């Protein structure tokens, strides 16, 4: 009887030890993914939508002048938000890739200046500037347009602070770092979308397949 109790106790200890080892391995894998993501995309410095502990990180490289990015915002993002982001499965990050025209940089700077004050306001701006989009051959992103968006749609943003930040060295440096990151990753166009560090086709069906694959790991 005593021998049986000892064997049972040893079995329990062994089971606990195995669980600890498995837990350590899983924790290590998750942290490795986070470290890889932080190295590639600098998650902590980027605009994000969704829970920080979401298991899948989706990164969009975009240009507010890009017609395909506007289409992505209108057709793909709402479904991504409904099926994954709002359920805590995906956290979305936006990284500037201003490549179409001179005013692409101004749009990127505006987004960063708004994000500096309030992250939720950035995502309102994200939708509003895409709704204001004109032909990509026109320089339609102007300070007048940006100020109108801030004044009319973003009550949490201090307008005077926004004006100061828009052309500040700090904001220009942030946009430059985003551009450098895109260059290092050899981003070819926008929107370019990554799922847990892997480049994916930006259409919803392809993203769903890539996300579901990551969720099963």
Curated annotation (Swiss-Prot):
Family: Belongs to the thioredoxin family. DsbA subfamily.
Role of this protein: May be required for disulfide bond formation in some proteins.
Record's protein name: Probable disulfide bond formation protein D
InterPro entries: Thioredoxin-like_fold, Thioredoxin-like_sf
GO molecular-function terms, A-Z: oxidoreductase activity
Cysteine disulfide links: 66-69
Coiled coil start-end: none
Keyword Zinc carried by entry: no
UniProt signal peptide: 1-28
Domain of life of the native organism: Bacteria
UniProt keyword list: Disulfide bond, Oxidoreductase, Redox-active center, Signal
């Amino acid at each position: 009887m005593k021998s049986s109790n000892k064997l049972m106790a040893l079995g329990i200890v062994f089971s606990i030890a195995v669980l600890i080892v498995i837990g350590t391995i899983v924790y290590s894998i998750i942290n490795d993914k986070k470290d890889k993501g932080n190295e590639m995309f600098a998650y902590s410095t980027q605009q994000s939508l969704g829970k920080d502990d979401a298991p899948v990180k989706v990164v969009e490289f975009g240009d507010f002048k890009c017609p395909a990015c506007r289409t992505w915002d209108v057709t793909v993002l709402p479904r991504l938000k409904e099926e994954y982001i709002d359920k805590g499965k995906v956290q979305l990050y936006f990284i500037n890739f201003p490549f179409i025209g001179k005013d692409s940089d101004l749009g990127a700077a505006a987004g960063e200046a708004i994000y500096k004050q309030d992250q939720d306001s950035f995502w309102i701006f994200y939708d509003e500037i895409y709704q204001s989009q004109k032909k990509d051959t026109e320089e339609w992103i102007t300070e007048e347009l940006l100020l109108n968006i801030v004044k009319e749609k973003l009550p949490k943003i201090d307008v005077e602070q926004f004006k100061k930040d828009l052309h500040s060295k700090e904001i220009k440096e942030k946009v430059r770092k985003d551009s450098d990151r895109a260059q290092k990753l050899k981003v070819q166009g926008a929107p370019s979308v990554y799922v847990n560090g892997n480049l994916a086709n930006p259409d919803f069906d392809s993203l769903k397949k890539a996300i579901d694959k990551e969720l099963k790991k």
